[in-house]
């Protein structure tokens, strides 16, 4: 969707509008804390599986999305269009090697 929409908006508005996406990995926050951690702070089975599949071996902190977002909103990324930026500690690329 991001790529298609970027092309559509470029055809309509030229370089006045950019369409990009942030693709967050697993960030520990209130909405998923019980799914990923036990009451004592240890990982649930699912949380442990996520950690084992993430090269950084930790969950992200929601504040770690800020840098990518600020860059996408800045003049430093004016030629960036139709891309999805993964902020996931390597989760989507890790094959368990």
Give a label for each model feature.
Residues 1-9, 22, 72:
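Hydrophobic alpha-helix immediately C-terminal to the catalytic Tyr-X-X-X-Lys motif of short-chain
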Residues 66-77:
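Alpha-helical substrate-binding/gating segment
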Residues 2-7, 17, 66-67:
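Conserved active-site helix of classical SDR/Rossmann-fold NAD(P)-dependent CH-OH oxidoreductases
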Residues 41-43, 54-65:
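A conserved structural motif in NAD(P)-dependent oxidoreductases
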Residues 13, 18, 80-82:
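Short, small/polar-rich loop/turn modules that mediate ligand/substrate recognition or access, typified
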Residues 7-12, 78:
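Alpha-helical segment proximal to the catalytic Tyr-Lys
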Residues 24-35:
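Short, flexible catalytic-loop segment of classical short-chain dehydrogenase/reductase
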Residues 70, 81-97:
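Short C-terminal tail/terminal secondary-structure segment
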